């Protein structure tokens, strides 16, 4: 027999972000705990609104299946002595409710142990759910939980009611919260405004429909879809197109139970404000959706003097709600207009002295000092990249002004507009387009998935800003630990790598870090002998993560290009970021087309055996390290001659970074190496004669070293 189960937790208005998180958590937690309780079920439906969390489980058996379990007891030598049961055996059998003759001895990896096969009768589902429900509530996680009344129960907002039904029967659940006891029933509440009365849920399976009649759309996806469609329709009514941010849409979805679209209007005089100011006021501060005139790209769109909001109130009072919304946004936009006019009253450069009042970090001084460091680092990068004199001037100017907007009134009020306003104020002050654009772009990327700077000036200053933060904070010994990363150092390092790769900048990061660290120590009298090693390891770890997660390179191929605690590969990786990326992608491609498989066996085998030798890994040429007089077979001579032919191809690949040429050469040598190992004229590498052994290991070492120009084949796993 199967039943439908309903649990609803009724609350005061929950934070929107918690509603979404709770859905995700329950979608994982509830099926997992049911499976652990032998009540596996594929029909777990989680619902949530600002005032309730609910789950409906269909086709739930009324009891667990009966089952057998093998239960491990004490070691056999402790349970039996001279063939007779000891107190340990008696205690185990008593605890399990079985007879002594039911005990069995089985051999495990850790020795012989006593076991018992126990038949366990399935419990009623109602009893199991009674145990699980408090755990489902207790295990929910969020940022801010609270206590209420005089109890110890914690939840983001006070719990006001519980519904728990198995089909049409109430499942008794009690949540104790000091003197307050919350007891399950079949009564829920409808919409606060549209249906504030109690509603009775007669059957668990009817939950969604009963709530809908009380003006509650409990299904997050349905609610979100309705809101999105209402916004689009409303925008079309005013001959516009709404910009629907996925983040804002998700938030608004969890702020309402029965969404109603409301169209508002603002004075056209505010359209002279930069569009980013108006949309920031709407989206970030008021949770309104802006409306645009065209369907072009966002940057080209022209704002209309309208906005769209989603109300949780009475649809018949939409006009009154719109008036209230219009009053609020008028005040906010008037503030923005005042800030904008005030900020434009003086040129952007005149704000630089005020940066002395903004602290970057207590020991590192003000943002003005950070700007000086950014200018210095930007010059180093421009020098490395051999940038033209004209572009270098733009870079230096933009670096000087890149943080000036932080002390403007607009950015003080709307911090998310940093860089955006700097670009506009720079343009208004007569700075070149390259300088203005670079001021905005140096903040890019602002997070995972964000756009990257497109201009060389923006790229250089963005790199300089991030490298300054990394070296300075690491220089103070403030390394990120676990989830604690207050200066967003991981994001900064990711930005350095992604910008370099996106723009194909041939950066020598190893040299840059040395130069920046030297200047840092001179300026701040800090001593940290491990700084470069710590920074190198940190950046290499970020490179590894990006290759794995964003470039989808196999883990063993990532290890092959970065090495495993290999000093040569570490330094090489930071000296040429583009080469690391290109080698990883190339390896992935030749794995997929089968070419890697054709050279893998011989090179991997050679690499593993060569580890027993002492040949320097940078040695490529056989002339100085191979004694042909020690050859005992034709296969050795053939191997030697093949290596002589291989070296020029390796050197060309090393110089041009054309690794296909090296792989072609390795393909050519592979049969010769196979014959050396397993052919009719094969040899024993580990010869009793130490000189012959060394000579043969050197042959293998040379092949390994030539292949190392591409990757460490010892790290590659057979596909």
From Swiss-Prot:
PROSITE patterns membership: AA_TRNA_LIGASE_II_GLYAB
Compartments, as annotated in UniProt: Cytoplasm
Keyword Protein biosynthesis attached: yes
Chain intervals for the UniProt region annotation (Disordered): 65-84
GO molecular function: arginine-tRNA ligase activity; ATP binding; glycine-tRNA ligase activity
Entry keyword Phosphoprotein: no
Pfam families from the UniProt entry: DALR_1, tRNA_synt_2f
A cellular-component GO term for this protein: cytosol
Known EC number: 6.1.1.14
Enzyme class: ligase
Main location (coarse class): cytoplasm
Enzymatic reactions: tRNA(Gly) + glycine + ATP = glycyl-tRNA(Gly) + AMP + diphosphate
Superkingdom, natural source: Bacteria
Subunit annotation: Tetramer of two alpha and two beta subunits.
Stated family: Belongs to the class-II aminoacyl-tRNA synthetase family.
HAMAP family: Gly_tRNA_synth_beta
Protein name in UniProt: Glycine--tRNA ligase beta subunit
Taxonomic source organism: Trichodesmium erythraeum (strain IMS101)
Gene it is expressed from: glyS
